């Protein structure tokens, strides 16, 4: 079926001509200022009727130039399918919507170049401020942005960059989970599968893991520490490489994200090793939680982030910025889910 080409959009000048008024008068009416300038009701009705008939919409960017605000917030996250980021974005979008703000979300795919492109496109749309989960630790690019547009950081933050952020307080919970798992299961080895070490959450989670081993009195073997990125395929491949090196499964694994856990479970399923979880020959723990873990026939202890509280804290920063109030960073506590 042929798709009909849309009709040419009517201009403000054409509406004014059809209504028999000046372009200035038509602009005042269509921007909701007709009554303020005491334009007669019948004139306002005539202009509005013509605009509606032709599907005319006032230029939001032109209005924003006058108001010095667009009421649009730009947000760049690394993975739209990631449960944590998706949950936070969903709550934040509703909070913005309820206050008359539009949250526009873009994805970086955890790629610095894609992050830059997404930011540039949002800046082209004159967003009032940016919320980003940076894919790198280099402050130079952001130093250029903040000269003109304010930036808040979510989940991750760049050191030596004076930006307010909202992150999870992950290190204490990870340390407690690791220490208690070692003690309860009598572990002599414990592998760590993490994402890019250049990212602030990766460093925090690794430090929490190491702290937990110290608390449990288990000496760290550097061969236990593995890093790639946070995609499920990386969890799969890291476990495959570990098994190839050891010739067996390790005693225990901590995955630094639920996405990495997905990859680990896929490896175990494809290699018919899920029974090792049931027999207790393999112990899995993870950062990030999902309700699905409650339905499994084996135990996977997890650490849940409070995505609603994270979104609320971030929205609080947005509101404070719009009110020109002082901004402060927030760390939101995590919760351990024992199973």
Region annotations inferred by a language model:
Residues 84-98, 173-177, 200-219, 234, ...:
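Short, solvent-exposed amphipathic alpha-helices that sit
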Residues 132-173, 178, 198, 259, ...:
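Flexible loop/hinge segments that line or gate small-molecule binding clefts
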Residues 23-28, 65-79, 189-196:
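Short beta-strand segments enriched in small/hydrophobic residues
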Residues 164-192, 207-211, 232-240, 261, ...:
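Hydrophobic alpha-helical segments within soluble ligand-binding/sensing domains
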Residues 104-124, 175-176, 224-246:
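Structural motif
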């Amino acid at each position: 079926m042929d798709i009909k080409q849309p009709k040419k959009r009517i201009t403000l000048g054409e509406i004014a001509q059809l209504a028999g008024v000046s372009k200035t008068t038509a602009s005042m009416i269509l921007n909701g200022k007709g009554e303020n300038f005491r334009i007669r009701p019948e004139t306002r009705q005539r202009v509005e009727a013509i605009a509606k008939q032709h599907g005319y919409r006032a230029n939001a960017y032109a209005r924003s130039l006058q108001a010095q605000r667009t009421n649009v917030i730009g947000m760049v996250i690394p993975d739209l399918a990631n449960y944590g980021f998706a949950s936070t974005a969903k709550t934040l979008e509703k909070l913005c919507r309820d206050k008359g703000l539009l949250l526009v979300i873009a994805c970086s795919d955890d790629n610095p170049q894609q992050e830059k492109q997404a930011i540039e496109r949002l800046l082209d749309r004159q967003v009032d401020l940016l919320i980003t989960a940076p894919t790198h630790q280099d402050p130079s690019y952001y130093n250029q942005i903040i000269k003109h547009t304010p930036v808040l950081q979510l989940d991750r933050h760049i050191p030596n960059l004076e930006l307010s952020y909202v992150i999870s307080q992950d290190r204490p919970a990870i340390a407690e989970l690791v220490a208690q798992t070692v003690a309860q299961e009598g572990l002599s080895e414990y592998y760590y599968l993490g994402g890019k070490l250049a990212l602030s959450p990766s460093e925090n989670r690794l430090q929490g893991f190491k702290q937990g081993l110290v608390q449990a009195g288990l000496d760290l073997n550097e061969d236990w520490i593995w890093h790639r990125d946070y995609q499920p395929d990386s969890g799969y491949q890291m476990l495959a490489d570990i098994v190839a090196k050891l010739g067996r499964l390790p005693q225990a694994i901590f995955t630094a994200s639920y996405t990495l856990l997905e990859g680990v479970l896929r490896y175990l399923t494809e290699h018919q090793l899920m029974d090792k979880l049931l027999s207790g020959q393999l112990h899995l723990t993870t950062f990030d939680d999902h309700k699905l873990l409650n339905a499994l026939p084996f135990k996977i202890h997890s650490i849940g982030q409070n995505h609603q509280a994270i979104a609320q804290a971030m929205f609080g920063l947005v509101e404070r910025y719009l009110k020109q109030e002082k901004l402060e960073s927030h760390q939101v506590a995590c919760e351990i889910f024992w199973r």
